[in-house]
Design a protein with these regions (language model features):
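Structured, solvent-exposed acidic/aromatic patches
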Residues: 1-32, 36-205
């Protein structure tokens, strides 16, 4: 289950990095956890988010509303952005938690993590715009007007890296096994509206 993945991996960084004098590690872990956490809400709705993030897995678990989880994640992102702006960690510091010999999202630049955090805020805002338009607009504007900004076309956008081309299971399924293809109904919709993403998202046989 999802609670066995990112929450377990990020727990120590979130809870112990500050006492070790490395709050920037906490900031990065909060951003990664936010990226995973908001998708849990989007996929499943209510979830025992606080229990999972504190590594509590045995019942009874306290399920929280999606809106409450979103608010927690917004707070986490605000904290992470604040920490990174205050600390402005060096590339050498990031080398302790990122393999900078391989191209990653930040490439050792703390500003890229801030941009990524702002992009998550924007995505969350768009997800909630029909439920709470006022808060959605506020969060979206907060992200795009931030002094560091958001990821643009000139920035790297791949937050993961793979030492082998087929190390990503989805890439292997789609490209080696040829098992993921565009459905005829979706293709028809894209063609009917002359949608430009048809040629951006999909390759021809």
């Amino acid at each position: 289950p999802m609670d066995n993945q990112i929450f377990t991996q990020s727990y120590n960084a979130i809870h112990h990095a500050t006492e070790l004098g490395k709050p920037e590690w906490r900031a990065v872990a909060l951003i990664i956890q936010a990226y995973q956490g908001h998708e849990i809400v989007d996929f499943y709705g209510a979830a025992p988010f606080s229990d999972w993030r504190n590594l509590k897995r045995t019942p009874p678990l306290t399920y929280e509303k999606g809106e409450d989880i979103y608010n927690l994640i917004f707070d986490d992102l605000d904290e992470a952005i604040r920490i990174l702006k205050e600390r402005q960690p060096s590339r050498e510091e990031f080398a302790k938690i990122e393999d900078l010999t391989i191209k990653t999202l930040s490439n050792g630049d703390w500003r890229m993590w801030v941009k990524f955090a702002n992009c998550i805020k924007m995505r969350m805002a768009m997800n909630m715009v029909k439920i709470n338009p006022g808060t959605a607009q506020s969060k979206f504007e907060q992200a795009v007007t931030d002094e560091i900004g958001v990821l643009t076309d000139t920035d790297a956008k791949d937050i993961a890296y793979y030492q082998e081309q087929n190390a990503c299971a989805l890439w292997r399924i789609g490209n080696e096994w040829h098992d993921i293809r565009l459905g005829a109904s979706f293709e028809n919709i894209l063609k009917r509206y002359n949608h430009p993403l048809l040629t951006r998202w999909f390759d021809t046989n």
